[in-house]
Amino acid sequence: MRRRLSLVFLALAASTAALAAGAGARSQDTKLALVAYSTPAAAYAQLIPAFQKTPDGAGVTFTQSYGASGDQSRAVIAGLPADVVNLSLAPDVDALVKAGLVDPNWNKQSYKGIVTDSVVVFVLRDGNPKHIKTWNDLLKPGVSVILPNPFTSGGARWDVMGAYGSWRRQGKTDAQAQANLLKLFQNVSVQDKSARDALNTFLSGKGDVLLTYESEAIAAQLKGSKIQYVIPRSDILIENPIAVLKNSSNKDEANQFLRFLRTPAAQQIFANNGYRPVVKSVLQANASKFPKRAGLFTIDQLGLGGWSKVQPRFFDPDKGIVAGIERKVGGATG
């Protein structure tokens, strides 16, 4: 009897050890593919090691891909491996929904699917020699504007809607605001594919003003660039979404990573890299770094109607308002 019990205990011990070894192997073999827009690489260089130090992140490794948000979305649709996508704006995630790659309820999750916020800023030469402070200043003759192409860069779409919405807020009619957009694009000297490429172009000495994310201006200053930036009085709240792919073979780990990114510790890392936290307590703790603007509006306000209306009206590559403007100035729409 004792011999039979001993054999049973040995079998159970062996089975438990095998299960533990199997779980350890799965943990060690877990690799998440992160596909993101062009700017947050420096933040993720800190966030990923911080996640790996948590129980959920132990043994999880990452592959990372960064580029223009629209291009990244199209690349995932074309087959670029991805478990997690962090893109510039909702339409680029919605394109993945239409392709059957992301759950339609991605924006019903915590914080409506948003992981960071930002605002549009004007990055200027040291001393602001052209005295640029307002959206109207961008229309002055002789002002050279650096703005990425809105048909590849999500950041550029935020820039365009920040400009259009601000002019509408000033009392301009739709037609007048569209006319101002044309004047703005006539002053654009370089249209790069992404916000990061546009920043590099500006830092190389081209242009008088760069339209970009607040985080890009802060990143440039952290690296010692002699630039300054202005947050216009009327501005748009930029909301950067994140989602897990439906076909991910590591959904549990991917969702654990998303939950980690919204912890106070992770949100502080984002704040350190120039991104406005979505967790209110962390945003309040960094209030001096991220000044409030009374004229801040969202893509759902001022009659804009949200991205579901803005995307086709402004950015349809064939019939959109901005596509028509690009054709007039000789720009690309794809």
Feature names for model-found ranges:
Residues 127-133, 152, 165-173, 247-254:
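Short helix-loop capping/hinge motifs at secondary-structure junctions, enriched
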Residues 1-31, 334:
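Short, low-complexity disordered leader/linker segments with a strong preference
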Residues 114-119, 181-185, 192, 223-255, ...:
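Periplasmic-binding protein-like
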Residues 2, 252-334:
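Extracellular/periplasmic juxtamembrane helices and adjacent flexible linkers that interface
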Residues 49-56, 136-196, 200:
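Ligand-binding cleft/hinge of the Venus flytrap
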Residues 170-233, 241:
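Ligand-binding pocket segment of bilobal, Venus flytrap-like solute-binding proteins
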Residues 45, 49-57, 77-81, 90, ...:
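Sec-exported extracytoplasmic/periplasmic mature domains
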Residues 27-152:
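N-terminal segment of the mature folded domain
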